[in-house]
């Protein structure tokens, strides 16, 4: 493990990848790579954040992100505890402000927060002196998901982003994962394509730094990787999709599609997967699938995030 003390981390919070410079991103990825080594040891724990406290404040349901942050904190020897809406006074009508101030009175070093309202994490970060990590806010942003995806792609692409092409496939309009990945990866020189039914493309997408497709076979041709997005089934109920079977026929990623991509192209998915709808069984289980690599990358990347925020005021540099 190498926590290079020459780089000054300038951010109290991690709310959106838009706040990160290219140097910030590359430093964080390098730090995550050093933490990745810990996860392969027989004893997967170091005392780096001993005495620090991390609160997992998840007002919106989460399994992967919350568990990943919990494991990340524990592997750095931080004390972690989780609080959801049902276990907080929010369920009794308390305001978000009062709940946040109550948590701050317990002197946490970092609060990781997920909320269904866009901007909620920034609101809390502006209130509190401790570090705040946005674990996902509405349709707005999911910075650590984008960072772990970036980490996974960097490993798959032998540390080279320039000249690579990524296809993001699925519900672009309602995806905070897509928004965060598009900004982060284009800042590193990756070309982005998006593919979805017109009803699942956001307004103004033609002005985004992406190529837009509605035909999967055209979109996947010669790409270096594909990122499938989870289709939220309530979109059909909202009338945005005429029929799930039709969506699957046109937009479910299969082995036949990846045969059109560049040799060695990988497939990512933030999870949970709807097999047979967004991605075929054969594709999900193929050697090209990077889904489990993403899970491992998530722990290492979130270890890096917690380390940078929890130690920022300790007098050293990260």
From Swiss-Prot:
Catalytic activity as recorded in UniProt: carbamoyl phosphate + L-aspartate = N-carbamoyl-L-aspartate + phosphate + H(+)
Disulphide bonds in the chain: none
Keywords: Pyrimidine biosynthesis, Transferase
Enzyme class: transferase
One protein family per Pfam: OTCace
Protein's GO biological process: 'de novo' pyrimidine nucleobase biosynthetic process; 'de novo' UMP biosynthetic process; amino acid metabolic process
Superkingdom, taxonomy of origin: Bacteria
Record-listed carbamoyl phosphate binding positions: 64-65, 114, 142, 145, 271-272
Pathway: Pyrimidine metabolism; UMP biosynthesis via de novo pathway; (S)-dihydroorotate from bicarbonate: step 2/3
Alphabetical list of InterPro entries matching this protein: Asp/Orn_carbamoyltranf_P-bd, Asp/Orn_carbamoylTrfase, Asp/Orn_carbamoylTrfase_sf, Asp_carbamoyltransf, Asp_carbamoyltransf_Asp/Orn-bd
Known role: Catalyzes the condensation of carbamoyl phosphate and aspartate to form carbamoyl aspartate and inorganic phosphate, the committed step in the de novo pyrimidine nucleotide biosynthesis pathway.
Subunit and interaction comment: Heterododecamer (2C3:3R2) of six catalytic PyrB chains organized as two trimers (C3), and six regulatory PyrI chains organized as three dimers (R2).
HAMAP family: Asp_carb_tr
UniProt name for this protein: Aspartate carbamoyltransferase catalytic subunit
Organism: Desulfovibrio desulfuricans (strain ATCC 27774 / DSM 6949 / MB)
